[in-house]
Amino acid sequence: MSLRVYNTLSGTKEEFTPLVPGRVSMYVCGVTVYDHCHIGHARANVVFDMIYRYLRHAGYDVTYVRNYTDVDDKIINRANQEGVPYNAISERFIAEFDRDMAALGLDLPTHQPKATEHIAEMIDVISRLIEKGFAYAADGDVYFCVEKFDPYLKLSKRNLDEMQAGARIEVGEKKRHPMDFALWKGSKPGEPFWESPWGQGRPGWHIECSAMSMKYLGETFDIHGGGKDLVFPHHENEIAQSEAANGKPFAHYWIHNGFVNINSEKMSKSLGNFFTIKEVLEKYDAEVLRFFLLSAHYRSPIDFSDQNLREAEAGLERIYGTLAGIDENLTKGAEGTAEETDRELAEKAVTFPERFREAMDDDFNTAQALGFVFDLVRSANRVLGEGKGGGSNRALLAEARDRIRKVGAVLGIFTSEPRAFAERLKNRKAAELPITAEEIERLIAERIAARANRDFKRADEIRDSLAAKGIMLLDSPQGTTWKVK
């Protein structure tokens, strides 16, 4: 099966055929850098990082562009509130965004352009739109005339007449039509500005992405992505101004990720259920958050809650536990018996790459792909649990481990050493306990001494006391370790 993607423009899954065989051009709208990034931003960026990784895994040479909107009303307002230059705000939050994305394991895009470094390109596109009659200047501002672009609203499938009926042009408004949108905004006192044929001012939001995508990917490219909230007006307006300026299709495939809900409610600052990436990563491991975000199909809404994050944490811990178990089995040599090859494990291991590819080729279905990972994990755990890790099964277990690792590299998960992940998780959980790690280790040492002195009553008291605090002791020939329940 060849790769099929859901195209918002057509409303159907389509076979993916890039403009240039073997090469993919992809533009994804980046953040407006005026505040801390929230988990909605995390989802969008993890989703398109996954797509970027999978396309490369599939053999494509991918040019991936993700911009920074570093001049905007929100940035200017915050700068004025803090009494600092607008670029002090944008640079601060660009640095924070980069830290968040690095923590989530994102690969760097090919290009990360800033809007303020591409003003000349924006002015050029606006000038072409005016020359072609699709835009008009009005007292220092420039607007796009939506009535001149017949296919307007083809992405969002809205009706212009109905939208006009619900709109009102305020007194003094410069627009000819309520839905006309700004390409250039005349300067106001206290705002940054650039020189232009229409006077000093700054670009509108929508023209920024059109100009930057054209510069790095050309007038027509393969994939344009972003969150569903960008379909209208941002992406709709991008299509209008780009296709009007160039007279050719803008992007062939429009891909949009679904929303993040908080405890089944829409995430909103007004509802008080707004979480930044930084806040979430103070409580959960970054790989757990990434695993959670990939556990649902990218177009489906995903419900963010402590319960769901804990379940994702447990699932990831289970996979790492299997990888650790396989590693331990392999280091023991050919111990264990296997009268015959475990057929279920053999079938799951052999067919796994093909099943993974089929899931991902079906509109990047990470939920199904991870389901196949858990199928393989269950089979491997059963073989290990039954003590059948020797003989031909030893090679099958190694194959299962390597294949889980390989798809993990594609998805950006399972990239840690199992012991390192377990230690990270243990330390994070231990920070919430009513006892320090040092005190736990001291009690373990005391318990070992008590057992050596055959003081089993004291040893049991220590074990029970730690259990009451949520700590499980694990005794083995190599010694005693602990984990948080």
UniProtKB/Swiss-Prot annotation:
MF (Gene Ontology): ATP binding; cysteine-tRNA ligase activity; zinc ion binding
CDD domains xref list: Anticodon_Ia_Cys, CysRS_core
A Pfam family that the UniProt record links to this protein: CysS_C
Cofactor(s) in the UniProt record: Zn(2+)
Motif ('HIGH' region): 31-41
GO biological process, alphabetically ordered: cysteinyl-tRNA aminoacylation
Subunit structure comment from the entry: Monomer.
Catalytic activity: tRNA(Cys) + L-cysteine + ATP = L-cysteinyl-tRNA(Cys) + AMP + diphosphate
PANTHER family in UniProt: CYSTEINE--TRNA LIGASE, CYTOPLASMIC, CYSTEINYL-TRNA SYNTHETASE
Cofactor detail note: Binds 1 zinc ion per subunit.
InterPro entries recorded: Cys-tRNA-ligase, Cys-tRNA-synt_Ia_DALR, Cys-tRNA/MSH_ligase, CysS_C, Rossmann-like_a/b/a_fold, tRNA-synt_1_cat_dom, tRNAsynth_Ia_anticodon-bd
EC number of this enzyme: 6.1.1.16
Residues the record lists as binding Zn(2+): C29, C209, H234, E238
Coarse class of the protein's main subcellular location: cytoplasm
Residue window of motif 'KMSKS' region: 266-270
Cellular compartments annotated: Cytoplasm
Binding site for ATP: K269
Name the UniProt record assigns to this protein: Cysteine--tRNA ligase
One Gene Ontology term, aspect cellular component: cytosol
Gene3D superfamilies reported in the protein's UniProt record: Cysteine-tRNA ligase, C-terminal anti-codon recognition domain, HUPs
Source organism superkingdom: Bacteria
UniProtKB keywords: Aminoacyl-tRNA synthetase, ATP-binding, Cytoplasm, Ligase, Metal-binding, Nucleotide-binding, Protein biosynthesis, Zinc
Entry's family note: Belongs to the class-I aminoacyl-tRNA synthetase family.
